[in-house]
Amino acid sequence: MAAAVAPLSPQPRGAAASAALSPTRISRLQEKEELRQLNDRLAVYIDKVRSLETENSALQRRVSEREQVCGREISGLKELFETELADARKTLDDTARERAKLQIELGKLRAEHEQVLSSYAKKDSDLNAAQVKLREFEAALNAKEAALATALGDKRSQEEELEDLRDQIAQLEVSLAAAKKELADETLQKVDLENRCQSLIEDLEFRKNVYEEEIKETRRKHETRLVEVDSGRQIEYEYKLAQALKEIREQHDAQVKLYKEELEQTYSSKLENIRQSSEMHSCTANTVREELHESRMRIETLSSHIADIQKESRAWQDRVHELEDTLSKERENYRKILAENEREVAEMRNQMQQQFSDYEQLLDVKLALDMEISAYRKLLESEEERLRLSPGPSSRVTVSRASSSRSVRTTRGKRKRIDVEESEASSSVSISHSASATGNISIEEIDVDGKFIRLKNTSEQDQPMGGWEMIRKIGDTSASYRYTSRYVLKAGQTVTIWAANAGVTASPPTDLIWKNQNSWGTGEDVKVVLKNSQGEEVAQRSTVFKTTVNEGEEEEEEGEEEILEDVIHQQGSPRKPERSCVVM
């Protein structure tokens, strides 16, 4: 575990006990102290993680309650929408029936109109023939004036017939006009009905869009609440990180302050020495002045002494320059030490940031592992409930068996077990189940005797399963069952596919019979895969039989741990939760 090591503060000069310790011993003591501090911090982290888990569980309960409320509201809206949709469908059906009746009547009117047209054409042809005859009679009249008396009678009769025909033509024209008027009225009614039908369709589409917008708004509000919860947790993490960095900054500021005080003490002591030297130099200079004042009278005799004093003054000046150089070097060293300390502080900050990143990654891994463990626990509990086993630490059914005759007794405890008393070494068969699903359909159960396979729709929507295929594999053999094109598995419904010799009567849609297969088959390793109409795997379940030799309680417990590990490996890697069957 990487940890930031703070620079050691200098030990007091007078500590004899510390001087007696070796550097190795000092390093061990420092490491021990660092480990103690790290353990304390780890304990604080663990307590915080537990509190966060408690808060997370409370938030999950609140989210589940909110989802239930939203589900009830959505179900109410769904019922209201379905009622309105049923009314609209009923109205549409009535309109369709009326339209069919009108179409039938229109067909009859068209047939009558065609008959009238044919009769009119016939009468028109007769009129043309009569006119021809009239012209012939007139020609005959002109040609034969002698036959006028006899022809007048024929003429009157022909004229009367002509009048009758004209009256019939007028009546037919009136009937044709009435038929045309009725046709126009029926056409207007048809257009009106079509417009009403179109308006009803548009109203239905509008209601559907409103319903979808309400669903999207509800989902958006739900996602907004989840984002607000995640942002609150992020703020809390940032606050904790700021507090930790603040504590580290205060510690290093204290250490830098200690270094600064030591350097100031050293600088003060050296400055005091220089000041004392300067005072001594001042005293000497005063003495020299007095001597010079006294030696004015003795210039000739004391010139050599003045030269010596000048040499001493130059020596003191050199000493002052040397001390100034030393002071500048000390200042430079102090700047270097400060720069080194700042670099170490930056490195420690980077290390702390890396540690926090590692901690967040470990926390994410821990959450994923907790979800996986919860999923495995739920899966094992469901298997124990299905097999009517009492809760235990592992999902295993142990059956002891031997080849010789023996007495069998059943005991009750945390785990149901059938013990076989015999003198020989006994063997146990462990049955482990693993399942996963990526869609709405999951494989709930595989009968170990090969009688049935049970599926369940875990979603709140109906699932069409036309063209879906279920494949059973036992070793190198396989068999496939394909659903009909119209089969639909209702929301929350369970369907059982029975073998032909299971002795069960078909009861669609919950119980189906595979007439072409007498048994689903039995074996040590049974695997069932469910594929959709595109050939994509949406669910799978496997049952593994493992035979072990029971030679003692300790070996039995080790076998249980190995079986649990096999179950975990069959479920999928914990680092890939999307491939496992998460039971919420």
Swiss-Prot record:
Region (Head): 2-33
Biased composition annotated in UniProt, kind: Basic and acidic residues: 575-584
Superkingdom of the organism of origin: Eukaryota
Classification via InterPro entries: IF_conserved, IF_rod_dom, Lamin_tail_dom, Lamin_tail_dom_sf
Phosphoserine carried by residues: 22
Residue list for modification Cysteine methyl ester: 581
Renumbered ranges of motif Nuclear localization signal: 414-419
TM regions (residue ranges): none
Biological processes, Gene Ontology terms: heterochromatin formation; nuclear envelope organization; nuclear migration; nuclear pore localization; protein localization to nuclear envelope
Bias (Acidic residues) ranges: 551-565
Pfam family, one: Filament
SMART domains per record: Filament
Keywords, in A-Z order: Coiled coil, Intermediate filament, Lipoprotein, Methylation, Nucleus, Phosphoprotein, Prenylation
Protein name from the UniProt record: Lamin-B1
Natural source organism: Gallus gallus
